[in-house]
Regions:
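C-terminal end-of-chain micro-motif
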Residues: 3, 166, 253-254
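ABC family nucleotide-binding domain
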Residues: 16-222, 228
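Polar/charged alpha-helical tracts
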Residues: 5-6, 65, 132, 243, ...
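Conserved beta-strand-loop-alpha-helix hinge in the C-terminal portion
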Residues: 232-254
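A general boundary/transition motif marking the beginning of the first structured unit of a protein
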Residues: 10-12, 217, 237
Length: 254
């Protein structure tokens, strides 16, 4: 399928890209017990951009890690599509993350000995999969790093490194992208460029994205914002604006 074909494909019905049922995650024992997730039920729709917000310690990153198979929940179930993550062994989890999920983290996690281009194609290389060169060319051009592909991470700015991470997350056409504070180390211009690209990947290619963020302006790029507090989903907002997100955050704090 070409980029033109893919872009013109009618948007699929918004069935879940991922969902959790009564998800709990507990750390410690006795008086030191911390309930990071306390019975969360949440659905992330396919071909939608969802932001997850909440105060520090509310369970945002823990939720993402459990749903992506990076951490095991104490109880409850998580699904990526119709695949129950809890039923997978370590090898199957690795394969699922490699084949079906893309990750964008605040820390870039680029391999220092590889060039930017080699870092981007790493997921396909590890999977033994031929790189979709048309998709690769599209990604690096859209992200403005097509002239930096032979440079190593230390030769790139923070914004350029994060664009490489974004391209790497999308190179295998994942079912779902999890982004944990992806703009935390970026300046305002790089932040706007990154969020604009994520928004376009949803609008143009039906990509499904879940982004953890503290930034009310960044959350306004999403279709929906889910708010967490004390390990629970406490509110949500559809078609957010920066002002409506900020007002909701202020209300939660009272």
């Amino acid at each position: 399928m070409t980029l033109i074909d893919e872009a013109s494909t009618p948007q699929r019905e918004a069935t879940p890209a991922a969902h959790a049922v009564d998800l709990c995650k507990t750390y410690g024992t006795g008086d030191a017990t911390v309930h990071a997730l306390a019975g969360i039920d949440v659905t992330f729709e396919r071909a939608r951009f969802t932001a997850v917000m909440g105060p520090s310690g509310s369970g945002k990153s823990t939720l993402m890690h459990c749903m992506a198979g990076l951490d095991r929940p104490t109880s409850g179930k998580t699904y990526v599509g119709d695949l129950e993550v809890g039923n997978l062994d370590d090898k199957e989890l690795t394969q699922m993350r490699r084949d079906r999920i893309g990750f964008v983290f605040q820390s870039f996690n680029l391999v220092p000995t590889l060039t930017a281009g080699e870092n981007i194609t790493l997921p396909a290389d590890l999977a033994g999969r031929e790189v979709d060169r048309e998709w690769f060319d599209y990604l690096v051009k859209q992200l403005g790093i097509d002239d930096r592909l032979t440079h190593r991470p230390t030769e790139l700015s923070g914004g350029q490194q994060q664009r490489c991470v974004c391209a790497r997350a999308l190179i295998n056409h994942p079912d779902l992208v999890f982004a944990d504070e992806p703009t935390g180390n970026l300046d305002s211009n790089s932040t706007a460029e990154m969020l604009g690209f994520l928004r376009r990947s949803v609008d143009d290619f039906d990509q499904s994205i879940v982004m953890v963020t503290h930034d009310h302006q960044g959350a306004a790029y999403a279709d929906r914002v889910v708010f967490l507090a004390d390990g629970k989903v406490v509110d949500e907002l559809v078609a957010p604006t920066a002002d409506s997100v900020l007002e909701r955050v202020r209300t939660m704090g009272t």
